[in-house]
Amino acid sequence: MSVVHKACLIALLFVSSGVAQQCMDSASDCAANAGSCFTRPVSQVLQNRCQRTCNTCDCRDEANNCAASINLCQNPTFEPLVRDRCQKTCGLCAGCGFISSGIVPLVVTSAPSRRVSVTFANNVQVNCGNTLTTAQVANQPTVTWEAQPNDRYTLIMVDPDFPSAANGQQGQRLHWWVINIPGNNIAGGTTLAAFQPSTPAANTGVHRYVFLVYRQPAAINSPLLNNLVVQDSERPGFGTTAFATQFNLGSPYAGNFYRSQA
């Protein structure tokens, strides 16, 4: 990658407040109407029209009417039933605490509807904000999600609390970045930033480490990313939403996170 191309990439993606181009869908306006994906009867129209356009409204469930039951996700009586019945069809009730923990809107603008399964050595599981030690997360984990074998996905892991929980002015620190993943076979994707374990510095408070998966509308083939290898000095300041917007990835498909401190 030339110096010019790499400078362009950094300007586009590694400035979290930067402005990236919007979803290229002028006909159906799917991105603007994404908030109605789960509102009947409009949702049925949007689901059929927009599923592949901007990766919005990917819920295609007619039998269980899961989309209409989304308001029950916070109801202690009905949530277990809704989650059991609808998790696999529409990924509902899987917000994973992204809003209450502040990941929305700091990292992404909406919570993913599915959960990423993240397992470190000795069967240590990431579970929606649980606290893990640096020793427990020292090695690259096994990461899987509900994937379609013919689709391509992007995996991102970031720390939005860098350099410290009280002072995250440098933006998100990139810990892992793989694009064009077939299904959930991460080894078959293109690694732009190799996995880097979370090692928060002493006296910097509790850090959130966020895993995000985006479903790609097509393979990502951009001169900005060809032959890119992100250096350690370039990891701070990554913009997850800027990247997703630049490549029309829509909302995050799946996610999870844990907390850790020195």
From Swiss-Prot:
Q: Which InterPro entries match?
A: PEBP (IPR008914), PEBP-like_sf (IPR036610), PEBP_euk (IPR035810), Phosphatidylethanolamine-bd_CS (IPR001858), ShKT_dom (IPR003582)
Which positions carry the signal peptide feature in this UniProt record?
A: 1-21
Q: List, for all copies, the residue spans of the domain called ShKT.
A: 23-57, 59-93
Instruction: Alphabetically list the UniProt keywords.
Output: Disulfide bond, Lipid-binding, Repeat, Secreted, Signal
Major location category of this protein = secreted
Q: Where in the cell is it found?
A: Secreted
What GO CC terms are in its UniProt record? extracellular region
Q: Among its keywords, does the record have Repeat?
A: yes
Disulfide bonds, paired cysteine numbers: C23-C57, C30-C50, C37-C54, C59-C93, C66-C86, C73-C90
Q: Give any GO molecular function from the UniProt entry.
A: lipid binding
Record's keyword annotation contains DNA-binding: no
The task this protein performs is described as:
Binds phosphatidylethanolamine.
Q: Which family does it belong to?
A: Belongs to the phosphatidylethanolamine-binding protein family.
Recorded protein name is 26 kDa secreted antigen
Q: Which organism is it from?
A: Toxocara canis (Canine roundworm)
